[in-house]
Swiss-Prot record:
The encoding gene: frr
HAMAP family: RRF
Function statement: Responsible for the release of ribosomes from messenger RNA at the termination of protein biosynthesis. May increase the efficiency of translation by recycling ribosomes from one round of translation to another.
Superkingdom: Bacteria
Protein name: Ribosome-recycling factor
Gene3D superfamilies (UniProt xref): 3.30.1360.40, Ribosome-recycling factor (1.10.132.20)
Cellular location(s): Cytoplasm
Keyword Membrane in record: no
Gene Ontology molecular function: ribosomal large subunit binding
Pfam families to which the protein is assigned, alphabetical: RRF
Keywords attached to this entry: Cytoplasm, Protein biosynthesis
Gene Ontology biological-process annotations: translational termination
Main location, first listed in the record: cytoplasm
Length: 184
């Protein structure tokens, strides 16, 4: 039974981490190197993350500077950033790529908050599915005589506690991101 509980906790933690990674790519009106986290560059035929091909600096609150390690990859990186539809317009001077992060309009902020809530809801659904799987495993163990009926009840209560904690954590992560987006 403790195996089921530890796996439940681990899977729910992964769902929360996945949500955090997904939220990190959302532009909240400030430059952040995570903005380019999902951008893959076609580098010698292989899709390669920008972070492996260039250093990404934030010299000003709304400016990203991408300095390729290999200057020949500059145009490929610029093309990949354009293709990623991040709502930014990269400009190159032959040495580095500068990306001005535009200020968000109120309408765009509300749109982003809606997207964030949708991502959060997906994470909660994932957590509830994990709860269902864990409860099914516990019921199967009880049917097979591995655990008693009392242990089943205790186990399902523990799974519910882990679920509640995980959903609270998701709510906290969402609240922080919404506050970040709505702050001007």
């Amino acid at each position: 039974m403790s195996d089921i509980l530890s796996e439940t906790r681990s899977r729910m933690k992964k769902s929360i981490e996945s949500l955090s990674r997904e939220l990190a790519t959302i532009n909240a009106g400030r430059a952040n190197s995570n903005l380019l986290a999902g951008v893959k560059v076609d580098y010698y035929g292989a899709p390669t993350p920008v972070q492996q091909l260039a250093s990404i600096n934030v010299p000003e609150p709304r400016l990203l500077v991408v300095s390729p390690y290999d200057k020949t990859s500059l145009s490929d990186i610029e093309r990949a950033i354009n293709a990623a539809n991040l709502g930014v317009n990269p400009s190159s001077d032959g040495e580095v790529i500068r990306i001005m992060v535009p200020a968000l309009t109120e309408e765009r902020r509300k749109e982003l908050v809606k997207d964030v809530k949708k991502m959060g809801e997906n994470a909660k659904v994932s957590i509830r599915n994990i709860r269902r799987d864990s409860n099914d495993d516990l019921k199967k163990d009880e049917k097979e005589g591995v655990i008693s009926e009392d242990e089943l009840r205790t186990g399902t209560d523990d799974v519910q506690k882990i679920t509640d904690e995980s959903i609270k954590e998701v709510d906290k992560v969402l609240e922080e991101k919404e506050k970040d987006i709505m702050s001007v």
